[in-house]
Regions:
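Membrane-interface aromatic/basic loop that binds lipid-linked glycans or pyrophosphate carriers
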Residues: 5, 11-13, 283-357
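Short aromatic/hydrophobic "clamp" motif used to bind/position activated sugar donors
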Residues: 105
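Donor-binding/catalytic cores of nucleotide-activated saccharide
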Residues: 110-216, 221-238, 249
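Glycine-rich, basic loop-to-helix element that forms the pyrophosphate-binding segment
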Residues: 84-100
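Catalytic core of nucleotide-sugar-dependent glycosyltransferases
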Residues: 220-226, 232-260, 271-306
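Cell-envelope/extracellular polymer assembly enzymes that use nucleotide-activated donors
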Residues: 21-23, 42, 52, 201
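A conserved acidic beta->alpha catalytic loop
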Residues: 57-68
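Short, well-formed alpha-helical segments that are part of the catalytic scaffolds
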Residues: 31-45
Length: 357
């Protein structure tokens, strides 16, 4: 792999100083070396001279910081490294954004990786078309690289996106590449202070404010799903973080923007708060009644007519039986069914072990 790095370095020997096309900002916090290595190696591409990489160590323990710095020292990539006091992922992204110099900015997670060939083609699209926001496709993989889900939302090499549709799919900052100058001057801030929902709150607010987006069918991003993620094991203090994130998003938006995209914001609340947040409570906090009640009260206060939302009729996820139970207030029944399912799995496991013996 070192030979590959050297080959690309020689193809892109530094010339005169100029603005690079893309700044890639990667926050890291106690990231395992094996993930970080794969992340960095995936950024090797033929247009390496168009990229700067900004690593922001968000207060990692020294053993992890040391491994990260050694990986950076052994790389021929153009990398800037900063270490700061722990403040959360968006705090680290904001720090990196302040040090970025590229025309565009791309927020990555340190345990994910990209397709280097797709990255080359996307850089070419950015230089040719100069969009403010460019969305792309992605997949979800195991740490071993096996594909779990494929999300091919966008068709065509380069197309204008209907913003109402774009809002439905802007729940992560790493799903889009942004014009850095427009992003910084938009008045939209990276939402902080929550563990869950900060991506959705920021990305959605920015798209709604700017009102323009383009897409490509390139599958650029490989999202790694592993047991250590915040969404897999959310701490109990984050149980209602999504409500706070949503409120932070709405506070950043003009009333005219909220009115224009009311149906989309209402649907996002139904999806992320009523459904996903309720499922997290059922799965991780044993169906805590107070949390469930808080979610129901929030929905009815902020979107009193949510049951009439048009997306409930058109989005496929709204047809799932778990979604229907939650929508109709049958969370206790769903919790009992989930608990029964767990017990059945345990019983089947015991029977299986006895059969093997």
């Amino acid at each position: 792999m070192l030979a590959r790095e050297l080959q690309i370095f020689l193809l892109n020997k530094p010339g005169e100083m100029r603005m690079k096309t893309l700044s890639i900002i990667i926050p890291t916090y106690n990231t395992l070396k094996i993930y970080f290595q794969k992340c960095l190696l995936s950024l090797l591409c033929e247009q390496q001279n168009e990229i700067e990489i900004i690593i922001v160590d968000d207060g990692s323990q020294e053993q992890y910081s040391g491994e990260i710095k050694r990986e950076i020292e052994n790389s021929l990539l153009d990398i800037k490294y900063y270490k700061k006091k722990n403040g959360g992922q968006n705090s680290a992204r904001e720090y990196g954004l302040a040090h970025a110099t590229g025309k565009y900015v791309f927020f990555m997670d340190a345990d994910d990786y990209v397709d280097s060939n797709a990255l080359d083609r996307i850089i070419s699209l950015l230089k040719k078309h100069k969009p403010i926001i460019l969305a792309f496709n992605y997949d979800v993989r195991t740490p071993d690289g096996n594909i779990i889900e494929e999300h091919n939302r966008w068709k065509g090499e380069y197309k204008k996106v209907n913003v109402t549709r774009g809002l439905l799919y802007s729940d992560s900052l790493w799903l889009q590449i942004y014009d850095r100058d427009v992003f910084c001057k938009s008045g939209i801030h990276l939402v902080q202070g929550v563990r869950i929902g900060e991506d959705m709150a920021t990305a959605t607010a920015f798209l709604a404010t700017i009102g323009t987006e383009y897409s490509t069918d390139e599958c650029l991003y490989h999202y790694i799903k592993h047991p250590g993620s915040a969404l897999s094991n959310p701490p109990e203090e984050s149980a209602l973080d999504m409500l706070q994130a949503f409120e932070a998003m709405l506070k950043q938006l003009d009333i005219s923007v909220q009115t224009k995209y009311y149906a989309e914001f209402e649907w996002l609340a139904i999806l992320h708060i009523l459904y996903y947040n309720t499922m997290r409570v059922l799965t991780n906090y044993r169906g805590n009644v107070e949390y469930i009640k808080a979610i129901e009260v929030w929905m009815n206060e902020n979107f009193p007519n949510w049951r009439e939302n048009s997306y409930l009729k058109t989005e496929s996820i709204a047809k799932k039986w778990m979604f229907v139970l939650i929508k109709n207030g049958h969370t206790k029944l769903l919790f009992d069914l989930e608990e029964a399912k767990k017990k059945i799995k345990i019983i089947l496991g015991i029977v299986s072990r006895k059969t093997i013996k």
